[in-house]
């Protein structure tokens, strides 16, 4: 299967530091599930369903409060990382309450600079995180690095449309990116530049069509 052709939109990303992200999610952590849980529910459901078609070691980068953790099948050994210790504490509580036996580790770590060895995982998943990390293209390169050749990288994310009412709203919100803790303006081409990843599937997440799921294959 050849690489998919997708329309690209060029724009400059708003800078966000690791410190700003940590500060923002310290505020969001106590209310994240209540405010964003329903919004991301469909994306979590579809991404974990796809991930459950695989087996082996799985990395979830930007695991957050662990919304996805109870949904991974027992054939997957899951490691989750997040930059926010406040979010990770909630993920640990969720794992304990769910009695999830296949969670190998939950670690405070920067997705842009992971300490894992090359080719450590069979599949890597990044949901709702690439608009958050300080250097999204570096995060994509790291996801490729830690995934085995022939392995899979799944991305679920919001991508800006650049026009219309939604585009105007995204542009208006963009100046508040630091307080929000994510970039409302985030073009699709940002995640397509990694030479080690080949896009094999692109799917809009219904019902709201606000998120998109991308499946990449790790090139040997």
Predicted feature descriptions by range:
Residues 1-28:
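N-terminal, positively charged/glycine-rich alpha-helical extensions of SAM-dependent methyltransferases
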Residues 12-15, 19, 36-38, 154-213:
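C-terminal alpha-helical "lid/dimerization" subdomain adjacent to the S-adenosyl-L-methionine
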Residues 26-37:
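Class I SAM-dependent methyltransferase Rossmann-like catalytic core
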Residues 38-56:
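Conserved alpha-helix/loop element of class I SAM-dependent methyltransferases that forms part
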Residues 112-123:
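A short acidic, Gly/Pro-enriched loop at the edge of an enzyme's catalytic core
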Residues 123-135:
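A short SAM/SAH-binding and catalytic strip from SAM-dependent methyltransferases
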Residues 137-149:
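A short glycine-rich, Lys/Arg-flanked "PGG" loop and its adjoining helix->strand segment in the class I
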């Amino acid at each position: 299967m050849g690489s998919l052709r997708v329309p690209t939109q060029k724009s400059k990303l708003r800078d966000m530091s690791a410190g700003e992200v940590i500060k923002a999610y310290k505020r969001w952590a106590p209310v994240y599930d209540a405010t964003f849980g329903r919004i991301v529910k469909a994306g979590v459901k579809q991404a974990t369903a796809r991930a459950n078609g695989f087996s082996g070691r799985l990395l979830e980068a930007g695991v957050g409060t662990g919304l996805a953790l109870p949904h991974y099948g027992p054939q997957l050994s899951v490691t989750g990382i997040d930059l926010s210790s406040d979010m990770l504490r909630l993920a640990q509580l969720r794992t304990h309450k769910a009695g999830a036996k296949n969670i190998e580790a939950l670690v405070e770590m920067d997705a842009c600079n992971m300490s894992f060895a090359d080719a450590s995982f069979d599949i890597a998943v990044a949901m709702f995180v690439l608009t958050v990390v300080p250097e999204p293209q570096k995060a994509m390169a790291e996801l490729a690095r830690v995934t085995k050749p022939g392995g899979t990288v799944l991305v679920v994310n919001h991508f800006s449309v650049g026009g219309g009412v939604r585009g105007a709203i995204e542009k208006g919100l963009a100046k508040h990116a630091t307080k929000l803790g994510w970039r409302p303006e985030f073009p699709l081409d940002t995640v397509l530049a990694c030479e080690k990843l080949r896009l094999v599937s692109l799917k809009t997440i219904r019902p709201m069509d606000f998120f998109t799921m991308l499946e990449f294959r790790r090139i040997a």
